[in-house]
Design a protein with these regions (language model features):
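Hydrophobic alpha-helical transmembrane segments of multi-pass integral membrane proteins
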Residues: 135, 168-181
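Interfacial segments of multi-pass membrane proteins
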Residues: 11-25, 150-165
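Conserved glycine-rich helix-kink/hinge and helix-boundary motifs of the Major Facilitator Superfamily
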Residues: 27-28, 167-168, 227
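Short hydrophobic/aromatic, small-residue-rich stretches within specific transmembrane helices
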Residues: 30-34, 170-174, 195-196, 200
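Transmembrane alpha-helices of multi-pass small-molecule transport proteins
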Residues: 29-44
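Juxtamembrane transmembrane-helix boundary motif
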Residues: 2, 14-18, 23, 43-138, ...
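Short helix-coil transition sites and intra-membrane helix breaks within transmembrane domains
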Residues: 1-10, 140-147
Length: 243
């Protein structure tokens, strides 16, 4: 999952729920695992100079706040409702990733900001950008996923960043979102440190492999892998709810 810029929160939470752990505890544990796996991935991408730090600062500030409150208020939502939100959220993300990329000329308007990313100038539509980032942060913090499920489509489709840079940048943002969400969840007391540490060590191995594969994989293949794995996670969670 690190290979597609999501960190793996979708499947961490799924695996924990299927093992009998409550949704609230699974969300907290998932966030902790994400912190560990995305930290190592961020260091790797940073060394390879594929992280767009301007986007990290722009998006990170919004997700930091909204993810914390998502985790903090997660106790107000029932377990099944959180599972439904989880499934709908990542299914929509998979559908969005299958959409064709739009040229920047189609995206810019009077309600956009101009952002220079290296030698390329991008126009970011604030009417789309701000609500999507805030909702992504809140839901990610609440249900324990990385946020990369929506951040990658946002960075690729709305801003027009190449897939490899989007994955690397999203991974860095996952670290920010997961940390904020974890701190919010931690205040509710839903955390089993023994399970979390063991799973985090296992996840680190996959994270190191995934980051290296990212830079070697065709961008279109990354998009398809992203979409298919998101759909699978959504359908598995819906199955868990009704069966």
């Amino acid at each position: 999952m690190t290979m597609t810029g999501r960190g793996g929160g979708n499947f961490y939470v799924l695996a924990l729920v299927f093992s009998g752990i409550t949704m609230h505890e699974a969300a907290t544990t998932g966030q902790f695992i994400l912190i560990c796996s995305s930290l190592t991935a961020t260091i790797f991408f940073w060394k390879n100079k594929v992280v767009d730090w301007k986007l990290v600062l722009l998006i990170g500030g919004l997700t930091l706040v909204s993810a914390f409150f998502g985790g903090y208020y997660s106790d107000k939502f029932g377990g099944n409702l959180m599972k439904i939100i989880f499934a709908i959220f990542i299914f929509l993300a998979s559908v969005l990733m299958l959409k064709p990329f739009k040229k920047q000329s189609e995206l810019s308007n009077s309600y956009s900001i101009r952002l220079s990313l290296g030698t390329i100038v991008r126009h970011i539509n604030l009417y789309i950008f701000i609500p999507v980032v805030l909702v992504t942060g809140f839901v990610s913090g609440m249900v324990g996923i990385s946020g990369g499920s929506f951040l990658v489509p946002l960075i690729v489709l709305v801003i027009g960043v190449p897939m490899h840079i989007a994955v690397a940048t999203s991974t860095t943002l996952v670290l920010i979102t997961a940390t904020a969400g974890f701190l919010g969840h931690l205040s509710t007391g839903h955390f089993n440190i023994e399970i979390a540490v063991i799973l985090a060590i296992v996840a680190l191995t996959g994270s190191l492999t995934g980051t290296q594969l990212t830079l070697k994989t065709n961008p279109e293949a990354l998009k398809i892998i992203f979409a298919v794995t998101s759909m699978i996670a959504a359908f598995i969670m819906m199955y868990k709810i009704f069966y």
